[in-house]
């Protein structure tokens, strides 16, 4: 497994290689680069596919200190530079979209285009935060219960999602790391008023049944980014790229063509 020493982190990544146009896949909260296996398989013949584990996730390991999605965006841009890639299409699911938008704002030279999957530019409804915080507190204190595991599975993948492999990973997450990565989520800034500054071509893909981020948030993002296109995945949940890979891949392929 390759690693890159970047910004004080030991970033784990996968790279299909070659000198083809690059796609950089950034995963969602509590996930890792393997959530894009279906996309890497579909696109690696025509594109150089890089998928990476963000701070506090997967092979990159626990976050060493508090961080923001601007830090994650800087990690992504630095990873491209480490690999000798000047520009990539940033494909981001949920928090991967958060960092992709911030990369487009802070390092537009590195962002050829953006694909937002189950993501948003604005904030979560305030009434959601106490529930999420209580869940994190219970999880970090008592471990991953059956109830919490089932709740997370439903939020991420919907009722048909097989979350067993992910539960095994979640059970290994430390209490300190859980609080750190959720703090990053809770304290992020609202980008709504900055969307008009984004110049990269943008595709917004969102499921009708996303339990984490309602479709209206994707619609707002698509309306705010100049020229953005919205594709709605019928029956898709939060991680539609996993549960509805075929229509998601079709939307991405048509956007990239």
Regions found by a protein language model. Give the residues of each.
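Conserved acidic catalytic loop of the alpha/beta-hydrolase fold
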Residues: 70-88
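Conserved alpha/beta-hydrolase catalytic His-Asp/Glu region
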Residues: 124-130, 142-196
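Catalytic histidine-centered segment of alpha/beta-hydrolase-like enzymes
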Residues: 236-245, 249
């Amino acid at each position: 497994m390759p690693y890159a020493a970047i910004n004080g982190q030991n970033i784990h990544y996968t790279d299909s290689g070659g000198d083809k146009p690059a796609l950089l896949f950034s995963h969602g909260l509590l996930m890792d680069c393997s959530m894009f296996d279906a996309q890497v398989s579909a696109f690696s013949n025509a594109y150089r596919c890089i998928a990476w584990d963000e701070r506090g996730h997967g092979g990159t390991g626990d976050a060493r200190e508090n961080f923001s999605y601007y830090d994650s965006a800087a990690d992504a841009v630095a990873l491209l530079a480490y690999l000798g890639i000047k520009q990539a299409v940033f494909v981001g699911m949920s928090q991967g979209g958060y960092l992709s938008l911030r990369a487009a704002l802070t390092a537009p030279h590195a962002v050829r285009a953006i694909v937002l999957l189950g993501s948003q530019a604005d904030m979560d409804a305030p009434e959601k935060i106490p529930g999420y915080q209580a869940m994190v507190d219970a999880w970090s204190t008592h471990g991953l219960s059956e109830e919490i595991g089932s709740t997370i599975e439903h939020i991420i993948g919907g009722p048909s999602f097989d979350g067993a492999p992910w539960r095994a990973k979640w059970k290994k997450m430390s209490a300190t790391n859980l609080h750190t990565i959720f703090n990053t989520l809770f304290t992020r800034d609202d980008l709504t008023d900055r969307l008009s500054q984004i110049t990269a071509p943008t595709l917004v893909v969102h499921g009708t049944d996303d339990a984490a981020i309602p479709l209206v948030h994707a619609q707002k993002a698509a309306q705010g980014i100049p020229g953005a296109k919205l594709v709605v995945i019928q029956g898709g949940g939060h991680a539609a790229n996993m549960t509805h890979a075929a229509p998601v891949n079709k939307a991405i392929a048509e956007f990239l063509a």
